[in-house]
């Protein structure tokens, strides 16, 4: 079918046709376009708008196209888009009666519907992958409830924690990413079909029926908004950008922890590379590429917002340029989930090195201050000053945390406050021991092994409820 034959006197210039065609990325909505056309055709027949026998022919042709696949379409740029390519296929199969398929429908509401149908499935796929990843992280955390390591602030030793506790931080952030996607899905799952070009149609169509046929939760209440809204795309790509950031943070820590200086983990060979000149090298290339690809996903979001920012209502062809950025973001993040999951679940943990670092640089100092407060009723700020001075003196004296005892603490307290603390030596030793330090933090959300197990149990319950 020549769409231009009525209003225009010539075909589009070849380069202009290629420049404006969306066919290079319309394969993402091929299945959705068939589904949309089928639902609309069934509705037209149900409402008596087109003959039932014509509708049957159209649906048979669409079924044949679904079986043959997108390769059956003429994808020449002059066709413009997937909608016309599909219509041309049906026309070639059944003749001019194929034109009934477009009754009361515009490419404006059709593409908006296709995008929502296709994106709905992509979000569900990503969500399933994300739940699986969170589940796997939770399992890994259970294996490391007593793998003591140092936690960092400002990338400086801060306080002892466990790898299990740290892994559940990953799981918690990814759970929020999952929840954001579920919330966005509510706004994606709205039916624009029936809005036509922008003001619906004079044909007595049934929007409730197409909404049911396409499995949408509801239809959109304003036809102008329905054909021009792409905020659901921007919202989705923001969610994906945030998810990519969290995956990038995991990747960054794997890069750091696998260095000789940290030496906490070894990344699997399957997710590493080597150097073309330095034979000793084992490089965390997968983690580095994941980190870099996060920026490309963020770039897709910025581009989408830039395209949308000044468009008058309703439809503008500019909106066509939004969709490739959506699909690139979707494909990139889905790939990131899979490779980061494989990398993280395959790490080999050096428990001895992790424990060594936890006890090497006074990461237990906070608990020593807490014990002073509890045992002697001293304000925390005074205890903070005592322990801060103790750390400075110990470093100057070349002492490790394990070398500090209650006598040494009394010397420092005398210097700072003019009086000794005279704490039980066992209390001081316990406060400075990384494992004991962790075990004392039996607060919900904390690193004590039993608290991590509770966190895992709660996460598992959440995952189970979401999978139902």
From Swiss-Prot:
What general EC class does the enzyme of this chain belong to? lyase
Query: What pathway is it annotated to?
Result: Amino-acid biosynthesis; L-arginine biosynthesis; L-arginine from L-ornithine and carbamoyl phosphate: step 3/3
Q: Keywords in UniProt for this one?
A: Amino-acid biosynthesis, Arginine biosynthesis, Cytoplasm, Lyase
Recorded superkingdom: Archaea
Could you cite one Gene Ontology molecular function of this protein? argininosuccinate lyase activity
Say yes or no: keyword Lyase present: yes
Sorted alphabetically, the Gene Ontology cellular component annotations on this record are:
cytosol
The reaction(s) catalysed by this protein are: 2-(N(omega)-L-arginino)succinate = fumarate + L-arginine
Q: Which InterPro entries match?
A: Arg_succ_lyase_C, Argininosuccinate_lyase, Fumarase/histidase_N, Fumarate_lyase_fam, Fumarate_lyase_N, L-Aspartase-like
Enzyme Commission number(s) of this protein: 4.3.2.1
This protein's major location comes to cytoplasm
Q: Which GO terms describe its biological process?
A: arginine biosynthetic process via ornithine; L-arginine biosynthetic process
Signal sequence extent: none
HAMAP family named among the record's database cross-references: Arg_succ_lyase
Family, per the entry? Belongs to the lyase 1 family. Argininosuccinate lyase subfamily.
Protein name stated in the entry:
Argininosuccinate lyase
Species of the source: Methanothermobacter thermautotrophicus (strain ATCC 29096 / DSM 1053 / JCM 10044 / NBRC 100330 / Delta H)
